[in-house]
Amino acid sequence: MAGELTPEEEAQYKKAFSAVDTDGNGTINAQELGAALKATGKNLSEAQLRKLISEVDSDGDGEISFQEFLTAAKKARAGLEDLQVAFRAFDQDGDGHITVDELRRAMAGLGQPLPQEELDAMIREADVDQDGRVNYEEFARMLAQE
């Protein structure tokens, strides 16, 4: 089933969780999350950290348990799988890029044909490396901004 984890994947998540849970109490608090994110170059305010925790903290205790962490990981995985399916639907020739022609055909297939200028603008907006087509990373970045 989409979003489900294998025992090996769950073990990897447990290892990652334990690395962030520096006091070993079985939960991740705002201080631990902040330190882990800071190590990756992301500095979040206390309010941002609390908001991030609240999005995962289903029991409302202000901390993330391993079960809450796993639930969030499964949701993220399912979202990623949906994104990959959407990209493949647009990348009709399977070469890893969406061209203007593929976008035109896909939009027409969805019953939403668009004028050439709008198609060109959509590709230009998403095309970070300016090669005239959109790769998966550019596609994901574009959707994350919406």
Curated annotation (Swiss-Prot):
<feature type="binding site">
    <location>
        <position position="138"/>
    </location>
    <ligand>
        <name>Ca(2+) 4</name>
    </ligand>
</feature>
<keyword id="KW-0106">Calcium</keyword>
<keyword id="KW-0007">Acetylation</keyword>
<dbReference type="GO" id="GO:0005576">
    <property type="term" value="C:extracellular region"/>
</dbReference>
<feature type="domain" description="EF-hand 1">
    <location>
        <begin position="8"/>
        <end position="43"/>
    </location>
</feature>
<feature type="domain" description="EF-hand 3">
    <location>
        <begin position="78"/>
        <end position="113"/>
    </location>
</feature>
<dbReference type="GO" id="GO:1904813">
    <property type="term" value="C:ficolin-1-rich granule lumen"/>
</dbReference>
<dbReference type="InterPro" id="IPR050230">
    <property type="entry name" value="CALM/Myosin/TropC-like"/>
</dbReference>
<dbReference type="GO" id="GO:0005737">
    <property type="term" value="C:cytoplasm"/>
</dbReference>
<feature type="binding site">
    <location>
        <position position="23"/>
    </location>
    <ligand>
        <name>Ca(2+) 1</name>
    </ligand>
</feature>
<dbReference type="GO" id="GO:0000226">
    <property type="term" value="P:microtubule cytoskeleton organization"/>
</dbReference>
<feature type="binding site">
    <location>
        <position position="127"/>
    </location>
    <ligand>
        <name>Ca(2+) 4</name>
    </ligand>
</feature>
<dbReference type="InterPro" id="IPR011992">
    <property type="entry name" value="EF-hand-dom_pair"/>
</dbReference>
<feature type="binding site">
    <location>
        <position position="133"/>
    </location>
    <ligand>
        <name>Ca(2+) 4</name>
    </ligand>
</feature>
<dbReference type="GO" id="GO:0008544">
    <property type="term" value="P:epidermis development"/>
</dbReference>
<comment type="function">
    <text>Binds calcium. May be involved in terminal differentiation of keratinocytes.</text>
</comment>
<feature type="binding site">
    <location>
        <position position="57"/>
    </location>
    <ligand>
        <name>Ca(2+) 2</name>
    </ligand>
</feature>
<dbReference type="InterPro" id="IPR002048">
    <property type="entry name" value="EF_hand_dom"/>
</dbReference>
<feature type="binding site">
    <location>
        <position position="129"/>
    </location>
    <ligand>
        <name>Ca(2+) 4</name>
    </ligand>
</feature>
<feature type="binding site">
    <location>
        <position position="21"/>
    </location>
    <ligand>
        <name>Ca(2+) 1</name>
    </ligand>
</feature>
<feature type="binding site">
    <location>
        <position position="27"/>
    </location>
    <ligand>
        <name>Ca(2+) 1</name>
    </ligand>
</feature>
<feature type="binding site">
    <location>
        <position position="63"/>
    </location>
    <ligand>
        <name>Ca(2+) 2</name>
    </ligand>
</feature>
<dbReference type="Pfam" id="PF13499">
    <property type="entry name" value="EF-hand_7"/>
</dbReference>
<dbReference type="GO" id="GO:0030234">
    <property type="term" value="F:enzyme regulator activity"/>
</dbReference>
<dbReference type="GO" id="GO:0005509">
    <property type="term" value="F:calcium ion binding"/>
</dbReference>
<dbReference type="InterPro" id="IPR018247">
    <property type="entry name" value="EF_Hand_1_Ca_BS"/>
</dbReference>
<feature type="binding site">
    <location>
        <position position="68"/>
    </location>
    <ligand>
        <name>Ca(2+) 2</name>
    </ligand>
</feature>
<feature type="binding site">
    <location>
        <position position="32"/>
    </location>
    <ligand>
        <name>Ca(2+) 1</name>
    </ligand>
</feature>
<feature type="binding site">
    <location>
        <position position="95"/>
    </location>
    <ligand>
        <name>Ca(2+) 3</name>
    </ligand>
</feature>
<feature type="binding site">
    <location>
        <position position="25"/>
    </location>
    <ligand>
        <name>Ca(2+) 1</name>
    </ligand>
</feature>
<dbReference type="GO" id="GO:0007165">
    <property type="term" value="P:signal transduction"/>
</dbReference>
<feature type="domain" description="EF-hand 2">
    <location>
        <begin position="44"/>
        <end position="74"/>
    </location>
</feature>
<feature type="binding site">
    <location>
        <position position="61"/>
    </location>
    <ligand>
        <name>Ca(2+) 2</name>
    </ligand>
</feature>
<comment type="subunit">
    <text>Associates with transglutaminase 3.</text>
</comment>
<feature type="domain" description="EF-hand 4">
    <location>
        <begin position="114"/>
        <end position="146"/>
    </location>
</feature>
<feature type="binding site">
    <location>
        <position position="131"/>
    </location>
    <ligand>
        <name>Ca(2+) 4</name>
    </ligand>
</feature>
<feature type="binding site">
    <location>
        <position position="93"/>
    </location>
    <ligand>
        <name>Ca(2+) 3</name>
    </ligand>
</feature>
<feature type="modified residue" description="N-acetylalanine">
    <location>
        <position position="2"/>
    </location>
</feature>
<feature type="binding site">
    <location>
        <position position="102"/>
    </location>
    <ligand>
        <name>Ca(2+) 3</name>
    </ligand>
</feature>
<feature type="binding site">
    <location>
        <position position="91"/>
    </location>
    <ligand>
        <name>Ca(2+) 3</name>
    </ligand>
</feature>
<protein>
    <recommendedName>
        <fullName>Calmodulin-like protein 5</fullName>
    </recommendedName>
</protein>
<feature type="binding site">
    <location>
        <position position="97"/>
    </location>
    <ligand>
        <name>Ca(2+) 3</name>
    </ligand>
</feature>
